C-alpha cells in the first residue's frame, strides 16, 4: 500500500502507522498526539513533547519488578493444591515473559521468544484457578476468556479481537501496558475440528476460530473498537500490537489419552472405569502428549505450533481434594467456618467427613468444582435456621452426615450461656 493510500492526521500529517489511535470524522482525521496537544492547550498547561507522549505509558526497565519462578510458584501454592509440574511450567513461562519485556524495554539486541503455554487436563483439576491466581500476583495486565463464546469474523458471537479489548480494559486503556500483558483462554479444546478432514462448509466455531486466534497469538497489529462489538466503517479504533502478549490456553481434551495410547500401541481397556489405576494410566499418557496427538484431536498444526510449553494437569487424588477443602488461603471449609462464626456458632468437620465429601466430589467427575456444591447443599438449611436460633453453640459434620444423609449433630448452649 502506498503512503497516499494511508489515512493521515489532518493536523500533523502523521500516518495511521505512526500513531496509536487515529479517529475518523467526515473527511477528516485526528491522531492521539494532537488530541493530547489540544487538551494541554485547553487546560492552559504545557503540552508534553511528542517523545514524552510516546513513552509516558511505558515503565522504565528498572520499574518492572521481576518475580523469580520460585516466588511465582509460592504464590500459586497458596491457592492451588497439587499440579506441581504445571505450576513450575507456568512459573518459568511467566518469569521468562517478564525478562522478555525487560529486554525489549532496554533495547537489547538479542530478543527472547515467547513461551506460550497449553494446559490440558480434566475438569476441576485447577487449570483456570492457576490462571486466576496469576492475575492476583502479576504486575502486568491479565484477562481470562472463554473459547466457547468465540466465532470467526462475520458470524454471530464474540469476535476474537474482543479478547484483546478485555486485556486493554484490564490495563485501563494503557496500550503500552496491554502490549506486554497475559491472556488466558479457557475451554480451548472446544474449538477443535470435529474431524481430521477439512470441511467444505464454513466452520464457525472450530478451525475458523483457531485461524483467527492464530493471528493474534503469533503477533499482529489489531484494530480494537474501544467499546467492543463488531467493526463498522468510520469507527474509532485503538491499535494494539499482540506480538509481545503471552498466551496461556487450557482445556480438558476428553479422550486425548486414547489418541496417545493408539499412537504408542497401547490398549485403553478399562480406561472408562474411574479406578485409581485407570486415572494413573490416563495421567501417564497425557504426560507423553505430542503435537501429532493434538492435531489428531482436531487442533490445526499452525495453532499448536505457537505453544512451546504443553503440560498436563493431573486428576486430583482423594488426599488433594481434602487439602483443597481445608488448606488454601481461601479454602471453602474456612469460608463456611467464618460464616458460622459470625453467628457465634462453631462449625466442626470430622476428618472422616472431609474424606467422604472428597469421595463424593470424585464420583461426580468434576474435580474440585463439585466440592462447593456439596457443601452448599449440606449447609443451606443450617444457614437458613441458625441466624434465628440463639441456642446453638456448635455444629458437627460427621461421616454419616455425608454418606447416610443423617442430619448434622447440633450442640446446644448451656442454659446459663443462653441467659
From Swiss-Prot:
User: What InterPro entries does its record include?
Assistant: AAA+_ATPase, ATP-dep_Clp_protease_ClpX, ATPase_AAA_core, Clp_ATPase_C, Clp_protease_ATP-bd_su_ClpX, ClpX_bact, P-loop_NTPase, Znf_CppX_C4
The UniProt annotation places ATP binding at 122-129
Which SUPFAM superfamilies would you find in this protein's record?
Glucocorticoid receptor-like (DNA-binding domain) (SSF57716), P-loop containing nucleoside triphosphate hydrolases (SSF52540)
Q: Which SMART domains match?
A: AAA (SM00382), ClpB_D2-small (SM01086), zf-C4_ClpX (SM00994)
Its Gene Ontology biological processes?
cell division; proteolysis involved in protein catabolic process
For whether the record's keyword set contains rRNA-binding, the answer is: no
Any one GO cellular component localisation term in the record: HslUV protease complex
Report the GO molecular function annotations.
ATP binding; ATP hydrolysis activity; ATP-dependent protein folding chaperone; protein dimerization activity; unfolded protein binding; zinc ion binding
**Which Pfam families is this protein grouped with?**
AAA_2, ClpB_D2-small, zf-C4_ClpX
The answer on whether this UniProt entry bears the keyword Phosphoprotein reads no
Instruction: Report the protein's function.
Output: ATP-dependent specificity component of the Clp protease. It directs the protease to specific substrates. Can perform chaperone functions in the absence of ClpP.
According to UniProt, the name of this protein is: ATP-dependent Clp protease ATP-binding subunit ClpX
Query: Which organism is the protein's source?
Result: Chlamydia trachomatis serovar D (strain ATCC VR-885 / DSM 19411 / UW-3/Cx)
Q: Which gene encodes it?
A: clpX
